[in-house]
């Protein structure tokens, strides 16, 4: 979501990494969405009604979310001028960098907060600025899909911030998130709802 000076999240970038490279598997994305929705609904004890997608790119999560919950409210943010210009109106994508969430509160706290495949590209200073805002805006579960230096992953390594998994765990816990596993984190508002063995 943060763009180094020489890295552009333009049409070519999304085509290369999300279409041509074959990394965008629709069935896999649907399973991921179902996992996140199920976790949030389990802890909220009701269907989700609101989603905030930070670093949403072209809003790939939006269609599978709406297929599961047609009435939910979806709001996406991304730093890509291309994604905002091309899909802003039709997919509810607005401009913002990750660090903007130090002050940006675009909606009431949401049932499901998504920040998928973003945080491992955000420089540490900006990460520390924006992360508390994510905790404040999450009333249910956050899906924070992040790769650490221990991971061998396929995809874009340009701008990858090689930080150990324990670094992320500490940062997420410091703002009140509780680990649930599979990239899901329980919001600070609900941490008392989980038993000791549910929390990772």
Would you name each region that the model predicts?
Residues 117-121:
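Short catalytic micro-motifs in class I SAM-dependent methyltransferases
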Residues 114:
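A conserved beta-strand element that flanks and buttresses the S-adenosyl-L-methionine
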Residues 1-106, 122-200:
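Class I (Rossmann-like) S-adenosyl-L-methionine-dependent methyltransferase catalytic domain
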